[in-house]
Curated annotation (Swiss-Prot):
This is Putative ABC transporter ATP-binding protein SCO2324. Residues 278-293 have a biased composition (Pro residues). One of its GO terms (biological process) is transmembrane transport. It comes from Streptomyces coelicolor (strain ATCC BAA-471 / A3(2) / M145). The keyword Repeat applies. The lineage of its organism: Bacteria, Bacillati, Actinomycetota, Actinomycetes, Kitasatosporales.
Length: 563
């Protein structure tokens, strides 16, 4: 169904091909996983299937890509639209209508399908992806994960023969990700749909793959094979495979079920051994930054008096009885949360639970409808942005919101100036997080993971006492996640408070002191990470599921205990 024949792609201005010697075939009715570190060209390979590369992106494609017998060099994307449905890393770039139901119908309207067929397929897709309650909602009011489900649904309704998905579960909570992957598996098995998918969170998808195409490094030829065979030599692999490598299991397990069947000897070796703690207790607070200049004029006009911004507080962040309403949606209600200096807190919960709204309240982007919010000694929504930036930094779900320069070098230089940091500080952070990003590249030409890493570096340059991160591992491979965790752990040890909203249960297990679970805008659990995640089948990391009932969370803990 999809055939790559010795394909190389070189973008305009590049001296070397982004991908080279790509040669593989995806048979009809198979799900093939495209894996590899960040920046190796996975999105380029996916883009070539639908003709976006090179017709839209520019550059030179050598070799041949055919889809259902159509050569993508001679067929433009619109001439492949009846065969190929594509969902990229950025769902927002797909939307052309305002509401969920209209978006699901748009692709079918473009293909001229009869109204009765369109109505039936919209209803089917709403049910399949759990979108029925959102059918009339404006897309702009949805959470990132809800938008991702709508984007996937919009390419399912036309019933294409080929689905091309670039990190389709990156913004989904664990339960929603399982639902989407189950739908894809049903399409593959029952309808013969062909799926080519790139995904960094291999722990979610590896068990569904018929084959894996591994891009080991930029410009290197891919390795193709059965999932277990490729994972045995892959530089990127899920925790269950890492545990199997450590224990010497062969063949390597790809599922929790298979790993548990073979874990009894490992449990016996670990019996009585202390579980290492990789999240030391919070440290002493940082010195207080200069007092902010509050924005008070509009409050005085209303006869209100602003709260004293200099009132002492032992917390880096303090939320009391917080309620936030966004349009017609009650996003948060009765939320109480405190974060101490040096503490790392993971906000978790279903898509639309209110995690991003809570971060927005902490950085002053939304105003409480009830209750109070403090970031250190500042009231965020009443503090001038130039003062607030030195107290709290936010890396949003869409990193492009922070990037405006024409090159990586200019972006880093601006970050150094804005933070009064030594020249080269941002660049050094970027190189530590993700080596190999050149100074002269435009931020828009980076992969999603590379863009996120650049935005992280820009915010971390100011070293704010309170650091907020919204889905910080979206688009990052395991090595980049490990480097990010190391940097965040170092910041916490210096007294920085960190609050991250994430669906990445492995990151929460590795990094967080506490996990706060949100549901429908309310806090339903708040406690030590090991207690909260292990108690939940949805949020327990892979190692915890394999080695239960003891609270082992990461492969690193097991490795340290065995040495």
């Amino acid at each position: 169904m999809i055939r790559f024949e010795d394909v190389s792609v070189t973008y305009d201005g590049a001296t070397e091909p982004t991908v080279r010697a790509v040669d593989f075939e995806v048979p009809e009715g198979e799900l093939v996983l495209l894996a590899g570190p960040s920046g190796v060209g996975k999105s380029t390979v996916l883009g070539a299937v639908g003709g976006l590369v090179p017709h839209f992106t520019g550059g030179t494609l050598r070799g041949r890509v055919t889809v259902a017998g159509r050569d993508t060099r001679t067929h433009k994307p619109r001439e492949l639209a009846d065969v190929v449905g594509t969902v990229g890393q950025d769902p927002l770039s797909h939307f052309v209508t305002d509401t969920v139901e209209d978006e699901l119908a748009y692709g079918m309207e473009s293909l001229g399908l009869p109204p009765d067929v369109m109505r039936r397929r919209v209803e089917e897709t709403l049910d399949l992806l759990g979108l029925s309650d959102l059918r009339s909602r404006p897309i702009a009011t949805l959470s990132g994960g809800q938008q991702q489900r709508v984007a996937i649904g919009s390419v399912l309704t036309p019933h294409p023969d080929v689905l091309v998905l670039d990190e389709p579960t990156s913004a989904l909570d664990p339960a929603a990700a399982e639902e989407v992957l189950a739908v894809l598996q049903r399409l593959v098995h029952d309808l013969g749909t062909t799926v080519l998918m790139a995904e960094h969170r291999l722990e979610r998808v590896i068990q569904y793959a018929d084959q894996v195409v591994l891009l080991p490094a930029p410009g290197e030829a891919p390795l193709i094979g059965a999932p277990a065979e490729v994972m045995a030599v892959s530089p990127v692999y899920p925790p269950v495979v890492g545990l199997g490598r450590l224990a010497g299991w062969s063949p390597l397990p790809l599922t929790i079920r298979n790993a548990r069947r073979r874990a009894a000897p490992l449990r016996e070796r670990l019996a009585g051994r202390e579980i290492p703690d990789h999240t030391p207790p919070p440290s002493a607070p940082l010195p207080a930054p200069p007092a902010p200049r509050p924005v008070t004029s509009r409050w005085r006009r209303r006869g209100k008096r602003p709260e004293n911004p200099s009132a002492p507080t032992p917390y880096a962040a303090e939320v009391r009885s917080l309620a936030v309403r966004r349009d017609r949606v009650q996003a948060l209600r009765h939320v109480d949360l405190t974060v101490s200096p040096g503490e790392t807190v993971a906000l978790m919960g279903r898509n639309g639970a209110g995690k991003s709204t809570l971060l927005s309240a902490l950085v002053g982007l939304v105003e409480p409808s009830a209750g109070s919010v403090r970031a250190g000694d500042a009231v965020p929504h009443r503090t001038a942005p130039r003062d607030l930036v030195r107290r709290v930094g936010l890396v949003p779900q869409e990193p492009r919101d922070l990037l405006y320069a024409d090159t990586v070098a200019a972006e880093c230089a601006a970050a150094d100036r804005d933070a009064d940091a030594a020249p080269g500080t941002c660049r050094a952070l970027l190189s530590e997080l993700l080596p190999g990003i050149t100074d002269d590249i435009h931020p828009r030409d980076l992969s999603e993971g590379q863009r996120l890493t650049l935005a992280l570096s820009v915010v971390l340059t100011a070293r704010p006492p309170l650091l907020l991160l919204d889905e910080p591992t979206r688009g990052l491979d395991y090595a980049a996640k490990a480097r990010l965790a190391g940097i965040l752990r170092g910041l916490a040890a210096e007294g920085h408070a960190i609050v991250l909203a994430t669906h990445d249960v492995e990151l929460a297990a590795e990094l967080a002191h506490r996990v706060v679970l949100l549901a429908e805008g309310e806090v339903i659990a708040d406690g030590p990470a090991a207690d909260v995640v292990v108690a939940s089948p949805s949020y327990a990391p892979q190692v915890a599921k394999v080695l239960a009932p003891r609270k082992w969370l990461t492969v690193a803990q097991v490795r340290e205990a065995l040495t």
